[in-house]
Amino acid sequence: GYTLDEITNDVTGKTCACFEPALDYIVVKYPKWPFDKFVYADKSLGTQMMATGEVMSIGNSFEAAMMKAVSSIELGMDTLTHKPFEELTDDEIVAHLYVQDAERVFCVYEALKRGIDHETIWKITKIDWWFLDKMQHLADLEKGLAKCNGVLSLEQYQTAKKYGFQDKTIKRLAQVDALPVENYRAGFKMVDTCAAEFSANTPYFYSTYDGDNEAAEFIAAKEAEAAANGQPKKKKVLVFGSGPIRIGQGIEFDYCSVHCVWTLKNHGCEAILVNNNPETVSTDFDTGDRLYFDPLNPESVDNIIATEKPDACVVQFGGQTAIKLAKHMDEIGLPILGTPADAIDEAEDRERFDELLERCKIPRAPGRTVFNLEEALAAADEIGLPVLMRPSYVLGGQNMIVAYTKADVIEYMGVITEHVDMDHPVLLDKYIMGTECEVDAICDGENFLIPGIMEQVERTGVHSGDSICVYPAQHLTQAEIDTIVDYTGRFARELHVTGLVNVQYAVSNGKVYVIEVNPRSSRTVPYISKVTGVPMVDLAVRCCLGEKLADMGYGTGLHPNAPYVAVKVPVFSFEKLHGVDTQFGPEMKSTGEVLGIAPNYHDALLKGLIGAGYTFKTPGPASCCIFTVKDSDKPEFVDIAWKLKSMGYKLYGTSGTCAWLNKHMVPCNEVRNMSGESPNIVDLLQSGLVDYVFSTSAKGRDPKRDSVRLRRKAVELSIPCITAVDTANALVDCLRSDHDLKNIPLVDIATLYHKK
């Protein structure tokens, strides 16, 4: 019932909410699409949203804001020049302007660089002339720098900086080794909504090169006020956020960053946040003591450090985006709170990690490091197929695959080298079939605390972010649990971890192998914190500040199991991403998750599956299921098919699967594949009689393959398509159980939390 003139504007603290904002800055919001992960996906844009996240950039000109946005989106670009477009002819560029896809803005930029007139571009794209003029200005600046031929004037340099060009970009384009001004630092302006007409209370800043530094003035005023009041000077800590939400690095890391800030503030520190994602709580103007809305790259961070002069920084809560800054922080001498940069590198570098395992006497799958196709083929021969292939320094299994044949190795090396900077090698590991487990631990440099061991329902080979995850682990022996706890402690001590560490294990035939170690927060930290009642980020930050786990009241070693089961089920957005194979693999594809909690495993699983959108149908008179599975999965699908048959389903299978099921006494009807003549599997899918599709194939990814087209067709028709044996088992067991959500008792998660 309040009127706008009765509500105070929180930003200024002086004007009321009916005061019209006056802005002296321009904001660009740029989408983050998942096409760097899904190389075969259709990149066409339309009325269906396909972005998984976004970045926001603020500048005192459109050009500067746009350059910041391109740097923030983490595509490995520092200007709007996209290398594939440089190789096209003018006619091909004009033809590509008609394509509405995620790369269109880069195509327009290339057209402007080539001198293609604005009228032609406008007629094709209908992009406003104002934007074309601004992008033309950027293109002219870039071309001007490229013509320097090793001689860069002060005026050219300052103009380029004003419009958003980074030092490394200017050096590369102008072909110079030294700049006219070394350490030319940006100033910071305040986001105040009133164009500096009133003094604002919000410590919310963006960088500019126009000579002003309102952040420095704000800091000096605050420090003078504190000194006048006799308050001690607080320790300043820089906290790096995780940038745009994308598959593999989502809102979980914002949870960690925000909880880190809250704990720092509660323990007498000034928490200064750096992030560029407008969707997050970390970029609310009142979360940290100060907020810098700028790209998370070394130069932007150096500018902030020059103004703030922090005492330390925290990199372990911002995902891989923040971890990539650790080495730079180490080089410039800014102390890192928690695990040191060298330990982070030791966990990521294959050779150093192998040496670490030798020292800890911990087994792992045999692996090799390769830089090109010849080395990859030789390594695959030496280790033996199948092999797990992935670039180093990735999160979310980006460009990660299991190669079953030499042809797979050749195809995937082509994909990886196209999308990943080959300064870092490709890692090949022997693929071990077994149960995958995951541990998040808190360490204080000596002792460690494991809130709980998580077990993945899907076996190794399916990315942990796409697997159904269960706490506490259901199928581990006490000896295996003891080994996991022992190995985690060895890693924590040997790496000198202070804060959080995530370790993934494969358990096969009673033997525990390590898959990877990440000395940082992981996407399971919010999940395990909530279901165990152990505030992991809070304890980790306190460890970073010098406290000991033994004094925090949660004990050390493995925390006692909760008296219920919590199941985390992934959620996918395949209906929005055309051309993406829905089959699970080592590359993460899920865009979210839900949680099911119940007194036992099956009830928790049922709640989780229903929450994730799985439908539980009662078979009608003509209801059927389709099976088309790879040879290695056929033995395990016999039992699944028999259970569905006993429920009343009619079974259909492609030739090989049908023959296998009939041979093992499960009646099944053959259906022609998608490339076969009608009536075929497509007609059956469109009949409306199919309740479930079970499809696993040895080959995937390529949208032209029958198996991929089948799974895509099922998604388009909203038919549940199960692509992993273990998920199929879980679903069928829930279908056959007589449990109902109405009969499952509620678990009040809020009762887990109690102050220690």
Residues of each region from the PLM?
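Acidic/histidine-enriched active-site and ligand-binding environments that engage anionic O-linkages
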Residues: A378-L388
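ATP-binding N-terminal substructure of ATP-dependent carboxylate-amine bond-forming enzymes
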Residues: A69, V191-I362, F371-A378, I597-K755
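Compact, charge-rich alpha-helical regulatory domains located at protein termini
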Residues: E119, Q158, R172, V666-C668
